[in-house]
Structure formats: structure tokens, C-alpha cells
Amino acid sequence: GEQYAGDGAYVDHFIFVKIGTGIGAGIVSNGRIHRGSNGCAGDIGHICVDKSGPVCRCGNTGCLEAMAAGPAIAERAVQVALDGDSPLLSQIFHANRGVLSTEDVGAACREGDKSALEIVQTSGQMIGDVLAGLVNFFNPSHIFIGGGVSHIDSHLLVSIRRAVLRRSLPLATGHLSINYSRLGASSGIIGAVA
């Protein structure tokens, strides 16, 4: 969708990153979608970020998706609430009858909750670390961030940017733009229709 109706329509080399229940990427090179030999290019959610991390739904351990996507954010928030490390998350957890969502974590961030901020920043840093490798390899001019979890809190985007700039080569980031997709969570639907 980003290539047809978003800011990517005017860009020849970009990566669109979807952050939701999973994490994936669309890659556009020379104005064309890169799908790979079997159509699965961009499945960045299964890049390992911690070999001793949790088991992912794919069967491997420490995948980016298992560590930084929406369900992982909510699971970490539940653990923080159960441990009593955040009175606000604990209050929301009990009010929601033992459930926390990414929206709850975002709301706690906006209230200044340090534990919620740490959860979001950690996810952003992990995503940014993976994207830094892609920036060094692919050298896009733009990275667009979208998906249902992308707007959880502005600290997610800030943490992604910080990690990419810290871990990428200066030549690759000199003119790199990392911003939200203006299509938001609708990008995939728009792409399917296009």
C-alpha cells in the first residue's frame, strides 16, 4: 500500500515495516517490490535478536517478533504488573480482569509510567537494531513504520531511529528518513487492493 498510496509512491528505495501481532517488512528497490525467490522477502520478524530469548511461533528462539511485537509488549507489561513494578499497569491489569493490551501500555506511557516506557523503548531498540543491518545492506532512502502497534507511543519511533542511527554506517544514514507511514494500519489493506 505504501508504494501505491503512501509517501513511498515518490521513492525508489524504501522499506516499509509493519509492527503488529507480528513484524514484517516490504522492500522496494528501483521502484519495484522485491519479493525474493519464493515470495517471502522481508520476513524480518524471524531474525534472531536473542538466542536465549523466548520460543517463537516459528519454533526458533529469540526472534524479533517474539521479543518486540504486540503480544511480546503485552506479555512484558503483564509480568511488570504481576511483579508490582508499576502501580499504574497493576491497576489497569486488575481493572481489566487480568489482561493488558498494547493500548494499555501506550496509555501508561502517556501517563509517564517508567516501566511502560522501558517496555516500549526496548521493543523499539530491538526493531531498530535489526533495521540497522538492513540499512547497511540495502541502503534505503526511507523507512516507513506502520501497523497496528506502530503508534503505541512516540518513544517507539524515537527508539527505532536512535538504534538505526547508532548501529548503521554514517554513509548509509546521511540522507535516511525514518517516519510513520501516513497510511497507518491501513497500508496492508490498501496494498492488497492495489
Q: Model regions: which residues?
A:
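ATP-binding/phosphotransfer module of carbohydrate and carboxylate kinases, centering on a glycine-rich
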Residues: 4-11, 51-55, 60-194
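Short, structured beta-strand-loop surface elements
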Residues: 1
